[in-house]
Amino acid sequence: MLAALFTAILVLVPSHARAQATLGAPTAVFPEDFGTIGSVRELPDGRVLVADPLSNALYALDMDAGTRVVIGREGEGPEEYQQPDGVWALPGGSTLLVDLGNGRLTTLDADLAFVDTRPIATGDPRPNGDSPLVVVLPRAVDASGHVYVQAVGVGFGGPWADSVGILRIAGIRQAIDTVARVKRQDVRRSESGGANNRNVEISPIPLSPQDAWGVAADGSVVVVRTGDYSLEWFGADGTTVRGAPQPFDAVRIRTAEKEEYLAAQGRSGGGIGIRIDISNGEIQMGFQRGGGGGSPREIDQYDWPDRKPPIYSGTVLVDPLNRAWVRRHVEAGEPSTYDIFDRAGFLTATITLDNGNRVIGFGNGCVYVVRYDEFDLNYLERYALPST
């Protein structure tokens, strides 16, 4: 009787159930809030750079002392920025800063002095233009300083491609090669104006399936396929390793899921808007983060799929132990869930955080997590990096 009952209980356990763990207690909690934390970069001396595009500030934090100083200032000139959105480690202790408002990439040296700038976008977005449009909004930078971006995949007025390339750019704007191709998010497109004064608006469909990807320090690229939830590692030496598909339950998108998605978009700064204006042959491009959130009353303004894809779109973070942290979609109100995969594509662990919290980066033996309060203000916490 007991054996029969025990067998029945085992049958009821889902085949894809995972043992879950937490990160434990934080080793440091920064006491002051941020408008939104776009990205973090741990400096060699242990300080942490934080780009806050909504507060329009670049901070250097001492997590242990609980202090911060502003690096640079707001403006359009040298040592200035508008909407600092991302910070990435470069060789020699330098840092790459994404300055959205000024449409440029800025290099800071090891002393955090502003060195030089380059435009985010180059090329011609029009069909049959002189050169293809390249928009350098980094998803990752490897230890050699190669920058990785997702190709735009559409010219101004051209068709919307279902898949695009992951581009590796040597020296920020030198040789470009395509590492892999990924499925992109579904969109809704609208156009206005005439041939010489034309506007195109492309709006992503929330929670539509999209491959996610990231880069390890050695330049290996990991792609998470949204169709069957499997990983592919594209090695810097040209080799490819494919992991087995992971079982998953596709979460039905109800009102609660829609509200949670829009709230998360708002507290994380929303998406990046790219504006392209062509007037009398002159091309102007602008970049801005914000406006991605929405109230419950705005839910019906969007097209929604019936179910969530298995994974979050965007960047897959790779930790110092060469493990990919993949955020998995769950029902509204459930803990934030990260599946951790090794270089062979095997699932090795599952980590959960409080609902809505997200992993933002890694440092020397640590994980940085963004926590939100009831007012959607951002706080930065540091945890020990789990070894298994």
Regions found by a protein language model. Give the residues of each.
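Accessible peptide chain termini
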Residues: 1-2, 18
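Bacterial N-terminal signal peptides
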Residues: 2-13
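Eukaryotic scaffold repeat domains enriched in small/polar residues
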Residues: 16-388
